[in-house]
Amino acid sequence: MERTLVLIKPDGVRRNIIGEVISRIERKGLKIVAMELRTLDEETAKAHYEEHVEKPFFSSLVEFITGGPLVAMVVEGNRAIEAFRSLAGATDPVLAAPGTIRGDYGLDVQANIVHGSDSTYSAEREIKLFFPDLA
């Protein structure tokens, strides 16, 4: 079974759609094996988004992701990374298909409700960062 990290970002928590996201994950046949509501500290946020450190939007991304509580989950299932990314939709909600989480609820590329690991390597690194006991 493959595992992936899923975050319901602060915009999703603020808009009270945690249950909707979880329902979609479960209906897809994926299993939530760990879940926590937390406010991310700046150090963890910077480590999580380290691949963007040189990009002009890095500071605003860190500020956004630390700006309120989020839900962190480890999701498991057959091809979990690909399965969740198909549920999430394109990063830009304008380009995300209707019926995807971002297509239905996302506002812009930052306030796009969820994050999901994009590769096996990223999933392992991100799970270790958020849930070290599961790594």
From Swiss-Prot:
Its EC number is 2.7.4.6. GO terms for cellular component: cytoplasm. The keyword Cytoplasm applies. It catalyses: a 2'-deoxyribonucleoside 5'-diphosphate + ATP = a 2'-deoxyribonucleoside 5'-triphosphate + ADP; a ribonucleoside 5'-diphosphate + ATP = a ribonucleoside 5'-triphosphate + ADP. Keywords: ATP-binding, Cytoplasm, Kinase, Magnesium, Metal-binding, Nucleotide metabolism, Nucleotide-binding, Phosphoprotein, Transferase. ATP binds at K9, F57, R85, T91, R102, N112. InterPro entries: NDK-like_dom, NDK-like_dom_sf, Nucleoside_diP_kinase. Disulfide bonds: none annotated. Belongs to the NDK family. This is Nucleoside diphosphate kinase. The gene is ndk.
